[in-house]
């Protein structure tokens, strides 16, 4: 996910985003490191994740070898 889009979602009333297929809420974004602090919707756990792991849908494209 783009850092500016992630920052927009912090202040929006948009639905959840997904980190590794799990619904999360973005709490903060560090644009310089391209990392975000997210909170799990399921259990409330907070973690730091790369913006590349955050999607606006729960579907992650898998590549088969």
Swiss-Prot record:
Keywords, sorted A to Z: Sporulation
Gene Ontology CC terms, in alphabetical order: endospore-forming forespore
Keyword rRNA-binding set for record: no
Signal peptide positions (record): none
Keyword Oxidoreductase: no
Gene Ontology terms describing biological process: asexual sporulation; sporulation resulting in formation of a cellular spore
InterPro entries named among the record's database cross-references: SASP_SspH
Subcellular location field: Spore core
Family designation: Belongs to the SspH family.
HAMAP family recorded: SspH
Protein name: Small, acid-soluble spore protein H 1
Taxonomic source organism: Clostridium botulinum (strain Langeland / NCTC 10281 / Type F)
